[in-house]
């Protein structure tokens, strides 16, 4: 068994690594190749390109990397032609992945989409590509299968969000927790995102908010959680520059950490976070949070033509209500960040109102096992279609068609349907 997996973002790299481990329980001798990051490689995948290093967002940034994306499409196509993998698994990252799916289908290779892109929120027309190029959609959100089914995609199943697998298995640093607990002052966790562009755009507002909040609530502590050391250096530079520009109070200290996101979320009384899967962790910890996503003014103008969802936060989408106050804007949001934090730190009733829906939602959706369920669905699909391909009454090509096409093929072979004229 040989499986090609592609993930283009840090969160996708994490989900791919967990899926590889789950697939190994089904296929112990399987080989994994693809595009991804360090976590995929650590799980045993052979990387054809470190796609996670190219994580980009919004229109112009994609355009500037267009040559690289085109080259990767040809790299994938050559791999499909020469190595003939048994399956292709794609994780989020629309755009490039539609082209990879197209090339895989052209080579007769089944395509699975794990943690599909949120096309229901901003690009509903792309469901046509799902119908055409994807054999099974492994949905991470409970309302997604119904959305796909209503648009003619019958091969969509809910497996759960793989982020909960990571939360269930991830140990916390007990000495770090103990040392932090001994310190005075409530902690505000600052989570500026996993992409360099996100950190650059969102962290300045968060630092300005920290300066404003520290004037209102002396003694409050702040800590920035970074994905890796490169982001830590960038974040430290932004913190230093922004504090100097804002004439921050001399007692204000903003510490910057790498690899301490779960610990800081566990310790914090409030969080300021960039929109993304980290919101699910904030939900699990029932931590009152404000969600921010800063984009350029032009990008926001273009996005408003496409965005169909009411919310940008996964938690708000799951609740279908504003559980986390959220701000998608090009404007300075530091006043709003400081205002909500001040409310939750000083008003216990307001804090309780913020945590109650999080606890309820956690019980409803925070179920681990998504990676195992996805692996089981992939294995079952491949087994069923391998048997169908081996049956003497069916052609091999029928194994890689949609359900409607396979039914029609059976009818033709049984004499129930006349062949079309040519």
PLM feature segments, named:
Residues 1-422:
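Nucleotide-activated sugar donor-binding and catalytic core shared by glycosyltransferases
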